Curated annotation (Swiss-Prot):
Residues 21-34, 91-107 have a biased composition (Polar residues). InterPro entries: REV_protein. GO terms for molecular function: DNA-binding transcription factor activity; RNA binding. One of its GO terms (biological process) is mRNA transport. The keyword Metal-binding does not apply. This is Protein Rev. It comes from Human immunodeficiency virus type 2 subtype A (isolate NIH-Z). Residues 16-24 are annotated as: Homomultimerization. The keyword Transcription regulation does not apply. The lineage of its organism: Viruses, Riboviria, Pararnavirae, Artverviricota, Revtraviricetes. Keywords: AIDS, Host cytoplasm, Host nucleus, mRNA transport, RNA-binding, Transport. Gene3D superfamilies: 6.10.140.630.
Length: 107
């Protein structure tokens, strides 16, 4: 059972890393030599950042299965929203509305 969980965790990490790599395609397109050079330079900077991020994703240990966060999530998943009763149809007048009506009548 733990082997399967480990394998699923590894697959999830690899999918995330693959998604990161797909978000940074190699630059293409026309332009002057300096424009192409700058695009490649910026691409290479992003590529290095993605490699560093992918390395930290891959090497970061998975949290234990029974961590307080997992227990809190399980508790929150058990919560449900109950049906609320219908609001009353006839509400008594508030004191503010009666005072304003009296002032209008006096004026």
């Amino acid at each position: 059972m733990t082997e399967r969980a480990d394998e699923e965790g590894l697959q999830r990490k690899l999918r995330l890393i693959r998604l990161l790599h797909q978000t940074n395609p190699y630059p293409q397109g026309p332009g002057t030599a300096s424009q192409r050079r700058n695009r490649r330079r910026r691409w290479k900077q992003r590529w290095r950042q993605i490699l560093a991020l992918a390395d930290s994703i891959y090497t970061f240990p998975d949290p234990p299965a029974d961590s307080p966060l997992d227990r809190a999530i399980q508790h929150l998943q058990g919560l449900t929203i109950q049906d609320l009763p219908d609001p009353p149809t006839n509400l008594p007048e508030s004191p503010e509305s009666t005072n304003s009506n009296q002032r209008l009548a006096e004026a």
